[in-house]
């Protein structure tokens, strides 16, 4: 493997639900993990489907929580957003954009194809410094509480297998094929370089 501890990133659109659920589970399992979003703003479900509540990425989870509490406590309790923001606040202060991160990872998981495309494009646009490989893996995860949890456990299982692998580079493709069969999901996978 590339390092003694697998360095993992999980990326979704807003760094609120899917990436943070995976962050929570991977952290509890003792893995080195960070989570990110890729959009220009954090968008949460609003009063109507076409009217999201929009926050800047500099807004903390606590500020979002308090704002939604003031706006409509019942709605945001019922749809689970207050629960999600409370969990997130216990993990880190606020959302982060992947494009602003300069840390190196061994594996980056994305939660939808558009996020995968953004991450790969960003990595390819950076000047290569160390030529260290980073595996970018996309797993389609619907942006619901249940699917985020199921996806997070699958990401965790993959990470644990990679952590135990003698040679991640040689074993990753085979592992992804096994996981595709087991989970009934297909993965996109590419290698970029730092």
Curated annotation (Swiss-Prot):
Keyword entries, A-Z: Hydrolase, mRNA processing, Nucleus, Protein phosphatase
Molecular function GO terms recorded: RNA polymerase II CTD heptapeptide repeat phosphatase activity
One GO term (biological process): termination of RNA polymerase II transcription
One cellular component term from this protein's GO annotations in UniProt: mRNA cleavage and polyadenylation specificity factor complex
The protein's Enzyme Commission number: 3.1.3.16
Subcellular location as annotated: Nucleus
Catalyzed reactions: O-phospho-L-seryl-[protein] + H2O = L-seryl-[protein] + phosphate; O-phospho-L-threonyl-[protein] + H2O = L-threonyl-[protein] + phosphate
Signal peptide region: none
Root EC class: hydrolase
Primary residence: nucleus
Domain of life: Eukaryota
One Pfam family cited in the UniProt record for this chain: Ssu72
Presence of keyword RNA-binding: no
Membership in a protein family: Belongs to the SSU72 phosphatase family.
Protein name: RNA polymerase II subunit A C-terminal domain phosphatase SSU72 like protein 1
Source organism per UniProt: Homo sapiens (Human)
Designated gene of the protein: SSU72L1
């Amino acid at each position: 493997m590339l390092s003694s501890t697998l360095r993992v990133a999980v990326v979704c659109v807003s760094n609120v639900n899917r990436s943070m659920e995976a962050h929570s589970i991977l952290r509890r399992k003792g893995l080195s993990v960070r989570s990110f979003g890729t959009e220009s703003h954090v968008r949460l479900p609003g009063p109507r489907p076409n009217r999201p509540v929009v926050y800047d990425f500099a807004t903390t989870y606590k500020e979002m929580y308090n704002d939604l509490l003031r706006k409509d406590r019942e709605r945001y309790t019922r749809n689970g957003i207050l629960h999600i923001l409370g969990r997130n606040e216990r993990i880190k202060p606020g959302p982060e954009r992947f494009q602003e991160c300069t840390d190196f990872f061994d594996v980056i998981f994305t939660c939808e194809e558009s996020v995968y495309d953004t991450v790969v494009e960003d990595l390819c646009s950076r000047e290569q410094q160390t030529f260290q490989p980073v595996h970018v893996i996309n797993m389609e995860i619907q942006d619901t509480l249940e699917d985020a949890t199921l996806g997070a456990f699958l990401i965790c299982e993959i990470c644990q297998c990679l952590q135990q692998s003698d040679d991640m580079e040689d074993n990753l493709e085979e592992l992804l094929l096994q996981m595709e069969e087991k989970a009934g999901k297909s993965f996109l996978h590419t290698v970029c370089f730092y």
